């Protein structure tokens, strides 16, 4: 629990640990001094232990239609301009911003995936890489006024997820994100069939 005695309010930081990673989120319980509020910023950080190889897409509010770039973390800023290719709807974020899910591999072979789960009535998260501190800072998609969300307690943020494995295929097979998402609200899913889309 994180207390703000000056404002007589608090939030909870909840962690869920799994064999292959963790999730954490912010919980805003109903309380006298916290009812309706605006998210101006989220300050979640992910500190890296090295200059990992990363597979990334440029951070963009409107599209994910970019080719995946492979580079060291320290090269993201330098490769960003070439990575932002023209398409019909794009709003790139900044030179160090990448989209989630972000996949990385350390020099000793550990795969690391940063993403989110249960993103319901909340802004999606991008990551801004700070070359000097080797830290990713969360960056939420804003509205036209720059606000990141309008909430009413009780409510929760999405889960921020970290999945790790010695094998890249284990990241894909992980059930961590599934287990953190809300249960399916569709009672009968028998009509849903897999398909291919090229667009």
Predicted features, each with a name:
Residues 190:
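Catalytic cores of extracellular degradative/oxidative enzymes
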Residues 193-199:
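N-terminal small/glycine-rich loop or linker at the start of catalytic domains
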């Amino acid at each position: 629990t994180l207390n703000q005695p000056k404002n007589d309010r608090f939030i909870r930081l909840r962690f869920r640990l799994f064999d292959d990673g963790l999730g954490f989120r912010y919980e805003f319980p109903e309380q006298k001094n916290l009812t309706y509020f605006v998210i101006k910023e989220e300050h979640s950080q992910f500190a890296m232990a090295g200059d990992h190889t990363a597979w990334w897409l440029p951070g963009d509010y409107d599209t994910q239609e970019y080719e995946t770039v492979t580079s060291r973390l320290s090269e993201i800023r330098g490769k960003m301009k070439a990575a932002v290719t023209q398409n019909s709807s794009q709003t790139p974020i900044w030179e160090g911003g990448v989209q989630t899910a972000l996949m990385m591999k350390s020099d000793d072979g550990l795969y690391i995936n940063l993403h989110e789960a249960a993103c319901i009535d909340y802004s999606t998260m991008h990551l801004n890489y700070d070359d000097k501190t080797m830290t990713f800072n969360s960056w939420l998609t804003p509205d036209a006024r720059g606000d990141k969300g309008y909430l009413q307690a009780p409510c929760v943020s999405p889960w921020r997820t970290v999945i790790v494995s010695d094998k890249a295929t284990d990241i894909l097979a992980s059930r961590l994100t599934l287990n953190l998402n809300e249960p399916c609200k569709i009672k009968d899913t028998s009509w849903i069939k897999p398909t291919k889309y090229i667009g």
